Swiss-Prot record:
GO annotation, biological process: urea catabolic process
Residues the entry annotates as binding Ni(2+) 2: K219, H248, H274
Positions annotated to bind Ni(2+) 1: H136, H138, K219, D362
Every Urease domain range: 131-569
Family: Belongs to the metallo-dependent hydrolases superfamily. Urease alpha subunit family.
Cofactor requirement: Ni cation
Pathway(s) where this gene product acts: Nitrogen metabolism; urea degradation; CO(2) and NH(3) from urea (urease route): step 1/1
Name this protein carries in UniProt: Urease subunit alpha
NCBIfam families registered for this protein in UniProt: PRK13206.1 (NF009685), PRK13207.1 (NF009686), urease_alph (TIGR01792)
Amino acids binding substrate: H221
Assembly, per entry: Heterotrimer of UreA (gamma), UreB (beta) and UreC (alpha) subunits. Three heterotrimers associate to form the active enzyme.
Entry keywords, A to Z: Cytoplasm, Hydrolase, Metal-binding, Nickel
Cysteines paired by S-S bonds: none
Length: 569
């Protein structure tokens, strides 16, 4: 006779199931479990007197015969493709299966075999997401990497050489010498890394040299001169070598206006950084470029979301980042031309309707590397409060909105940069870069980060305590952050050409190097849940933004969630 259990008790024991709802941190965002792949009455759970014991939930199957290395039990997966409850099996550092774990000798419909070689991570009552991807990194200091990892980022793409003046302003690792040194430096960090070369050169040989040296993309930045001719040269090489081009356009409109940049791009695929313009770009109307099908538009997090402090903090940030002088009126005018409340307010809404597709940091160069995920969901909260449920959602849940926003920091940046075969979502066959969250800390502080199948970061108490939980509890690096485990758990992304030229061996790289691919045959329609192509017009006098004839405007927030109640120091 079946034993009946009430929903509350079930959720407390095994985590929420289909039809249950979960609040995300202290936001007004609520998700509802769409499907449960575990089997009622046959759930697996570890612990004294629990299921995963020899002859019960643990089978006699050897690892060589199919038992997984790790199982995350009863997790609530939040990904672009769904919000479901499932067990997740990991083997050889990869996602082996998503479904029902257990012992096939005594349980039906087992997808993930637990054996004596299987470790268990308890996912009950936790949310599981893919490790996030930040594609706008200024590699100014190595300490950024630990900060990013602690926030749930597992892949960082960008450029730089350290705290050089050029790196402080631009995400470029210029030339083969610097690219080689940064690739060698990447060996030390428990993070997937990739580096952009400098794309600003009309001599295409300079660009080829950098791609052949290992650059996984090229970056055009106005501080190096983003003219129509450099745009054309850079895209020519990108098309030839299958790497992505990222662009920070000409704020001062010296070499042309946004229409000239669009003409120079000529329908070729390109990733536009801080597409609203406060981070840089044709003033005041770079934002209209998000209506182009070949443009993959992203934001950086200093303008996410629009609050009462957003405008005030930007001027000083901008002056420092771009090596401007407050004693020179023209420098001040340059900075002020980029900061417009009207376009920042419109940016919130363009994200909410899926017209802006990616959010990244702009680390230490106006953006905060540890706040990408937090600010993404602060924006989602703001739009829920100000605009109500999306058409695809209901009064019961915000599932579509949450999936739209999680896509901006996971699968979409992966697609944009040709690494989505490997990372960016929780799917069978991808690298097991996974983040486990308590719902009350979702998008703020991960409970645990898995990197390449091993635990790389976790909330951890006093190391001298008798159990793991006594305070002070804070995020700390775990074993996969050290030694050869680090080397095996993290990866470096390079151009295919550089791998073909044996660059990893020439540089004595030990991390597995993976080629980026399929960056040139994509467009905005390939980006998940964020592919809208609005017709954008910007009033040159008032800076008001219109999308398909509708004025896009919203008020700044006075108070955001996921903020001071989580960060006391």
């Amino acid at each position: 006779m079946a034993y009946k259990i009430d929903r509350k008790t079930y959720a407390q024991t095994y985590g929420p199931t289909a039809g249950d709802r979960v609040r995300l941190a202290d936001t007004e965002l609520f998700i509802e479990v769409e499907k449960d792949l575990t089997t009622y009455g046959d759930e697996v759970k570890f612990g004294g007197g629990k299921v995963i014991r020899d002859g019960m939930g643990q089978s006699q199957v050897r690892r060589a015969d199919g038992a997984v290395d790790t199982v995350i039990t009863n997790a609530l997966i939040v990904d672009w493709w769904g919000i479901i409850k499932a067990d997740v099996g990991i083997k050889d550092g990869m996602i082996f299966e998503i479904g029902k774990a257990g012992n096939p000798d005594i349980q039906d419909n087992v997808d993930i075999v637990i054996g004596a070689s299987t470790e268990v991570i308890a996912g009950e009552g936790h949310i599981l997401t893919a490790g996030s991807i930040d594609t706008h990194i200024h590699f100014i200091c190595p300490q950024q990497i630990e900060t990013a990892l602690a926030s749930g980022i597992t892949t960082m793409l960008g450029g730089g050489t350290g705290p050089a003046t050029g790196t402080n302003a631009t995400t470029c690792t210029p030339g083969s010498f610097h690219i080689s040194r940064m690739l060698q430096s990447a060996e030390a960090f428990p993070m997937n890394l990739g580096f952009y070369g400098k794309g600003n050169s009309t001599n295409e040989s300079n660009l080829i040299d950098q791609v052949e040296a290992g650059a996984c993309g090229l970056k055009l930045h106005e501080d190096w001169g983003t003219t129509p001719s450099t745009i054309n040269s850079c895209l020519n090489i990108a098309d030839k070598f299958d790497v992505q081009v990222c662009i920070h356009t000409d704020t001062l409109n010296e070499a042309g206006f946004v229409e000239d940049t669009i003409n120079a791009i000529a329908g070729r695929t390109i990733h536009t950084f801080h597409t609203e313009g406060a981070g840089g770009g044709h003033a005041p109307d770079i934002i209209k470029i998000c209506g182009e099908k070949n443009v993959l538009p992203s934001s950086t997090n200093p303008t996410r979301p629009y609050t009462r402090n957003t405008l005030e903090e930007h001027l000083d940030m901008l002056m420092v980042c771009h090596h401007l002088d407050s004693k020179i009126p023209e420098d001040i005018a340059f900075a002020e031309s980029r900061i417009r409340r009207e376009t920042i307010a419109a940016e919130d809404i363009l994200h909410d309707i899926g017209a802006f597709s990616v959010i990244a940091s702009d680390s230490q160069a106006m953006g905060r590397v540890g706040e990408v995920i937090t600010r993404t969901f602060q924006t989602a909260h703001k739009m829920k409060v100000q605009r109500g449920p999306l058409m695809q959602d209901s009064d019961r849940n915000d599932n579509y909105r949450v999936k739209r926003y999680i896509s901006k920091v996971t699968i979409n940046p992966a697609i944009a940069h040709g690494i989505d075969k490997h990372v960016g979502s929780i799917e069978k066959g991808k690298i097991a870069d996974l983040v486990l969250w308590k719902p009350s800390f979702f998008a703020v502080k991960p409970e645990l980060v898995v990197k390449g199948g091993s635990i790389v970061w976790s909330q951890m108490g006093d190391a001298n305590a008798s159990i793991p939980t006594p305070g002070p509890v804070h995020g700390r690096p775990m074993f996969a952050s050290f030694g050869q485990s680090l080397i095996k758990s993290s990866f470096t992304f390079l151009s295919k050409n550089s791998i073909d030229q044996n660059i990893p061996n020439k540089l004595s790289l030990q991390k597995k190097c993976i080629a980026v691919e399929n960056t040139r045959n994509i467009n905005k329609s390939h980006l998940k849940l964020n592919s809208k192509l609005p017709n954008i017009l910007v009033d040159p006098q008032t800076y008001e933004v219109f999308s398909d004839g509708e004025l896009l405007t919203c008020e700044p927030l006075d108070e955001v969630p996921m903020a001071q109640r989580y960060f006391l120091l």
